């Protein structure tokens, strides 16, 4: 019988996938301090920010701000996933904890880069970040299989976004391109896990495509 929950018969296979993810992630473990151009930093009290200090094209800055304001919602994303998968497969709860720890560095890296390079008005970016987090995240999908599908698509979209922005940024700041590609590696691993969870369910019961198609048709980034 088709349900919108995850199938407990798949838990052993998903546990194997989770262990494989941890091994792959450990091989590329990193700290966000490794990817920041610290030598470009200046004291904002001693040298106040001025628009003349900005060196990146406005389109690149907008892309980085967009990524940052998506990543800062991690607490809301984690709350959403934890609530949605409560009572479902324990391995998914374990993965969400790992996913959160790996995603936690992303907003720190992006915001610190923008501040170090003086690419944004520090007061404005602080206000934007606060406003976005206060606004929260209202999901459109509330069942485990739909949430899994939504997160798969979101990770894929974010991975593609980071890689595309890195291509453009490489002409203006190699440091930025490098850190974006590093973020894309995390997104690639996360996407692969979520995708494979969906794949195993489709292999077991092809009619899961009913729920999956609904998410695909109505998907939008947070």
Model segments located where?
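Non-heme di-metal
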Residues: 1-222
